[in-house]
Amino acid sequence: MSLDSENTISENNDVRINNINLIASIVLWLLFVITVIGTFKPIHRVSMESNFSKYYKYTYCVDDKCTCVDYFTYGKVTIYCYNKNSVNCLAINWDNVGIIVILIFMLMIIMNGFYQMMKQKISVEDLVIMNQQLEYQRQNRMNNLYYHDNYGNLRMRMPGDYGYY
């Protein structure tokens, strides 16, 4: 096998790993967005009568846009209606929209940093060595967790015991 073919195989593996990381980050981002939007419900349909004062404290309407304050949450809710007599309106809670936008930007920054970190070239040998080191640490801790005392009893190592890690 020539040096060029080995470099091509290594580059193909790097591209494959980067594509998998990109797809995983996109899927996680979409799941996060769906969860946040489902939790906060920033935009939802409101079924109203023509009497807005029955549902909201302060109401003022300009054209077909009505801004109201909810009785229960005292959050600013903007209601968009087709006209003043429409029954189904669209309510937007701008506080929740702001929270969602900030969380999405934070997630995009974090995922971009994660993608840049994973984009660095990591060989398969480095991954195998790191996995072996982690497995050795785990085995070493498990083997040293229990010991037999002078009387043959099986004991768990505690702080203060001889040889406690």
UniProtKB/Swiss-Prot annotation:
Topology relative to the lipid bilayer, per the entry, is:
Multi-pass membrane protein
Per the annotation, which location comes first and is thus the protein's main one?
membrane
Where, by residue number, does the polypeptide cross the bilayer? 20-40, 97-117
Q: Which residues are glycosylated?
A: N51
Tell where it localizes. Membrane
Query: Which superkingdom heads the taxonomic lineage of this protein's source?
Result: Viruses
- GO CC, alphabetical: membrane
Q: Key word Transmembrane present in the record?
A: yes
**What keywords would UniProt list here?**
Glycoprotein, Membrane, Transmembrane, Transmembrane helix
Put simply, this protein is called Uncharacterized protein R119
Origin organism is Acanthamoeba polyphaga mimivirus
